[in-house]
Protein backbone atom coordinates (compact mmCIF):
# COMPACT_ATOMS: atom_id res chain seq x y z
CA UNK A 1 0.00 0.00 0.00
CA UNK A 2 1.10 3.58 -0.60
CA UNK A 3 1.95 6.07 2.12
CA UNK A 4 -1.31 7.90 1.41
CA UNK A 5 -3.39 4.72 1.65
CA UNK A 6 -1.77 3.86 4.97
CA UNK A 7 -2.30 7.44 6.14
CA UNK A 8 -6.04 7.25 5.48
CA UNK A 9 -6.25 3.84 7.17
CA UNK A 10 -4.55 5.14 10.32
CA UNK A 11 -6.56 8.38 10.30
CA UNK A 12 -9.80 6.39 10.20
CA UNK A 13 -8.71 4.40 13.25
CA UNK A 14 -7.71 7.60 15.02
CA UNK A 15 -11.16 9.07 14.37
CA UNK A 16 -12.88 5.99 15.81
CA UNK A 17 -10.75 5.97 18.97
CA UNK A 18 -11.10 9.73 19.40
CA UNK A 19 -14.89 9.33 19.30
CA UNK A 20 -14.51 7.07 22.35
CA UNK A 21 -12.53 9.83 24.11
CA UNK A 22 -9.42 7.66 24.33
CA UNK A 23 -6.99 10.54 23.63
CA UNK A 24 -7.38 12.94 26.59
CA UNK A 25 -5.07 15.94 26.61
CA UNK A 26 -3.48 15.02 23.23
CA UNK A 27 -2.20 11.78 24.82
CA UNK A 28 -1.74 8.52 22.95
CA UNK A 29 -0.15 7.67 19.63
CA UNK A 30 -0.71 5.36 16.68
CA UNK A 31 1.59 3.81 14.09
CA UNK A 32 1.23 1.83 10.87
CA UNK A 33 3.84 0.04 8.79
CA UNK A 34 4.34 1.45 5.29
CA UNK A 35 7.24 -0.60 3.89
CA UNK A 36 9.54 -3.43 4.94
CA UNK A 37 12.72 -2.92 2.92
CA UNK A 38 13.62 -0.43 4.11
CA UNK A 39 11.35 -0.39 7.16
CA UNK A 40 9.28 2.78 7.29
CA UNK A 41 6.15 3.62 9.22
CA UNK A 42 3.75 6.45 9.91
CA UNK A 43 3.43 7.57 13.52
CA UNK A 44 1.39 10.24 15.24
CA UNK A 45 2.99 13.68 15.22
CA UNK A 46 3.75 14.95 18.72
CA UNK A 47 1.22 17.16 20.48
CA UNK A 48 -1.63 16.89 17.99
CA UNK A 49 -5.25 17.08 19.08
CA UNK A 50 -6.43 13.69 17.90
CA UNK A 51 -10.07 14.75 17.88
CA UNK A 52 -9.25 16.80 14.79
CA UNK A 53 -8.24 15.46 11.38
CA UNK A 54 -5.53 17.40 9.56
CA UNK A 55 -2.85 16.85 6.93
CA UNK A 56 -0.19 17.02 9.65
CA UNK A 57 -1.48 14.28 11.97
CA UNK A 58 1.29 11.78 11.15
CA UNK A 59 4.95 11.77 10.16
CA UNK A 60 6.92 9.18 8.21
CA UNK A 61 9.89 7.68 10.06
CA UNK A 62 12.57 5.06 9.48
CA UNK A 63 13.43 1.87 11.38
CA UNK A 64 14.98 3.89 14.22
CA UNK A 65 12.08 6.32 14.53
CA UNK A 66 13.85 9.20 12.81
CA UNK A 67 12.05 11.52 10.40
CA UNK A 68 12.47 10.77 6.71
CA UNK A 69 13.15 14.00 4.86
CA UNK A 70 11.71 17.40 5.73
CA UNK A 71 8.37 17.27 7.53
CA UNK A 72 6.45 19.81 9.56
CA UNK A 73 6.00 17.72 12.71
CA UNK A 74 8.11 15.57 14.97
CA UNK A 75 7.45 11.96 16.01
CA UNK A 76 5.41 11.23 19.11
CA UNK A 77 7.41 10.80 22.32
CA UNK A 78 6.73 7.06 22.49
CA UNK A 79 7.82 6.31 18.93
CA UNK A 80 10.53 3.98 20.27
CA UNK A 81 7.81 1.57 21.45
CA UNK A 82 6.56 1.28 17.89
CA UNK A 83 10.18 0.89 16.72
CA UNK A 84 10.49 -2.19 18.95
CA UNK A 85 7.29 -3.68 17.54
CA UNK A 86 7.97 -3.10 13.86
CA UNK A 87 11.61 -4.20 14.03
CA UNK A 88 10.88 -7.43 15.89
CA UNK A 89 7.51 -8.62 14.58
CA UNK A 90 5.46 -8.67 11.40
CA UNK A 91 2.77 -6.49 12.99
CA UNK A 92 1.27 -3.89 10.68
CA UNK A 93 -0.24 -1.54 13.25
CA UNK A 94 0.32 -0.54 16.88
CA UNK A 95 -1.92 1.60 19.06
CA UNK A 96 -1.10 3.33 22.35
CA UNK A 97 -3.87 4.94 24.41
CA UNK A 98 -4.19 6.42 27.89
CA UNK A 99 -7.61 5.69 29.39
CA UNK A 100 -8.78 5.95 32.96
CA UNK A 101 -9.64 2.24 32.97
CA UNK A 102 -6.27 0.99 31.73
CA UNK A 103 -4.45 3.30 34.14
CA UNK A 104 -6.46 2.06 37.13
CA UNK A 105 -6.01 -1.59 36.13
CA UNK A 106 -2.26 -1.07 35.74
CA UNK A 107 -2.06 0.37 39.25
CA UNK A 108 -4.24 -2.30 40.86
CA UNK A 109 -2.14 -5.16 39.47
CA UNK A 110 1.28 -3.51 39.23
CA UNK A 111 2.73 -5.43 42.18
CA UNK A 112 2.20 -8.80 40.45
CA UNK A 113 3.48 -7.54 37.11
CA UNK A 114 0.51 -8.69 35.06
CA UNK A 115 -3.26 -8.94 34.97
CA UNK A 116 -5.16 -12.03 33.84
CA UNK A 117 -8.72 -12.34 32.59
CA UNK A 118 -10.49 -15.71 32.24
CA UNK A 119 -13.73 -16.96 30.77
CA UNK A 120 -15.00 -13.73 29.25
CA UNK A 121 -16.74 -13.99 25.88
CA UNK A 122 -14.88 -10.94 24.56
CA UNK A 123 -11.60 -12.89 24.81
CA UNK A 124 -12.63 -14.52 21.52
CA UNK A 125 -11.86 -11.17 19.87
CA UNK A 126 -8.23 -11.84 20.84
CA UNK A 127 -8.23 -15.18 19.05
CA UNK A 128 -8.81 -17.49 22.02
CA UNK A 129 -11.92 -19.62 21.53
CA UNK A 130 -11.92 -22.04 24.47
CA UNK A 131 -14.69 -21.51 27.04
CA UNK A 132 -12.14 -21.15 29.83
CA UNK A 133 -9.60 -19.19 27.78
CA UNK A 134 -7.36 -16.77 29.65
CA UNK A 135 -5.44 -13.74 28.52
CA UNK A 136 -2.51 -12.34 30.47
CA UNK A 137 -1.27 -8.78 29.97
CA UNK A 138 2.16 -7.82 31.33
CA UNK A 139 2.51 -4.61 33.32
CA UNK A 140 5.77 -2.69 33.28
CA UNK A 141 6.86 0.33 35.28
CA UNK A 142 6.64 3.73 33.68
CA UNK A 143 9.86 5.58 32.88
CA UNK A 144 10.04 9.23 31.87
CA UNK A 145 13.18 8.40 29.89
CA UNK A 146 11.78 6.85 26.71
CA UNK A 147 14.84 4.73 25.80
CA UNK A 148 14.64 3.20 29.30
CA UNK A 149 10.91 2.59 28.82
CA UNK A 150 11.57 0.97 25.44
CA UNK A 151 14.14 -1.38 27.00
CA UNK A 152 11.60 -2.45 29.64
CA UNK A 153 8.97 -2.89 26.93
CA UNK A 154 11.11 -4.88 24.49
CA UNK A 155 11.13 -8.29 26.27
CA UNK A 156 7.33 -8.44 25.97
CA UNK A 157 7.31 -7.96 22.20
CA UNK A 158 7.29 -11.65 21.33
CA UNK A 159 4.76 -12.06 18.53
CA UNK A 160 2.86 -10.38 15.73
CA UNK A 161 0.04 -9.56 18.15
CA UNK A 162 0.30 -8.51 21.77
CA UNK A 163 -0.31 -5.93 24.46
CA UNK A 164 1.63 -4.32 27.30
CA UNK A 165 0.31 -2.13 30.09
CA UNK A 166 2.57 0.65 31.34
CA UNK A 167 1.82 1.50 34.95
CA UNK A 168 -0.17 4.72 35.36
CA UNK A 169 0.52 5.53 31.72
CA UNK A 170 -1.40 3.47 29.16
CA UNK A 171 -1.59 0.38 27.00
CA UNK A 172 0.20 -0.46 23.76
CA UNK A 173 -1.50 -3.01 21.52
CA UNK A 174 -0.31 -4.32 18.17
CA UNK A 175 -1.68 -6.68 15.56
CA UNK A 176 -1.18 -8.35 12.22
CA UNK A 177 -3.48 -5.85 10.50
CA UNK A 178 -4.85 -2.43 11.45
CA UNK A 179 -8.32 -3.94 11.92
CA UNK A 180 -6.90 -6.62 14.21
CA UNK A 181 -4.97 -4.11 16.31
CA UNK A 182 -8.12 -2.03 16.80
CA UNK A 183 -10.17 -5.11 17.65
CA UNK A 184 -7.61 -6.21 20.24
CA UNK A 185 -7.54 -2.76 21.81
CA UNK A 186 -11.33 -2.66 22.03
CA UNK A 187 -11.37 -6.11 23.66
CA UNK A 188 -8.76 -5.18 26.26
CA UNK A 189 -10.53 -1.96 27.15
CA UNK A 190 -13.80 -3.91 27.49
CA UNK A 191 -12.10 -6.31 29.92
CA UNK A 192 -10.68 -3.44 31.97
CA UNK A 193 -14.03 -1.66 32.17
CA UNK A 194 -15.89 -4.87 33.06
CA UNK A 195 -13.43 -5.71 35.83
CA UNK A 196 -13.61 -2.25 37.36
CA UNK A 197 -17.42 -2.20 37.27
CA UNK A 198 -17.49 -5.53 39.13
CA UNK A 199 -15.09 -4.12 41.73
CA UNK A 200 -17.37 -1.13 42.19
CA UNK A 201 -20.15 -3.59 43.02
CA UNK A 202 -17.92 -5.37 45.51
CA UNK A 203 -17.29 -8.35 43.24
CA UNK A 204 -13.70 -9.19 42.28
CA UNK A 205 -13.29 -10.94 38.93
From Swiss-Prot:
GO biological process: L-methionine salvage from methylthioadenosine
Cofactor annotation: Zn(2+)
Catalytic activity field: 5-(methylsulfanyl)-D-ribulose 1-phosphate = 5-methylsulfanyl-2,3-dioxopentyl phosphate + H2O
GO terms under cellular component: cytoplasm
EC number: 4.2.1.109
A GO MF term: zinc ion binding
Binding site residues for Zn(2+): 96, 98
Broad class of enzyme this protein falls into: lyase
Note accompanying the cofactor annotation: Binds 1 zinc ion per subunit.
Domain of life: Bacteria
Keywords: Amino-acid biosynthesis, Lyase, Metal-binding, Methionine biosynthesis, Zinc
Pathway: Amino-acid biosynthesis; L-methionine biosynthesis via salvage pathway; L-methionine from S-methyl-5-thio-alpha-D-ribose 1-phosphate: step 2/6
Role this protein plays: Catalyzes the dehydration of methylthioribulose-1-phosphate (MTRu-1-P) into 2,3-diketo-5-methylthiopentyl-1-phosphate (DK-MTP-1-P).
NCBIfam families named in the record: PRK06754.1, salvage_mtnB
Family of this protein: Belongs to the aldolase class II family. MtnB subfamily.
HAMAP family per the UniProt record, alphabetical: Salvage_MtnB
UniProt protein name: Methylthioribulose-1-phosphate dehydratase
Organism taxonomic ancestry: Bacteria, Bacillati, Bacillota, Bacilli, Bacillales
Gene: mtnB
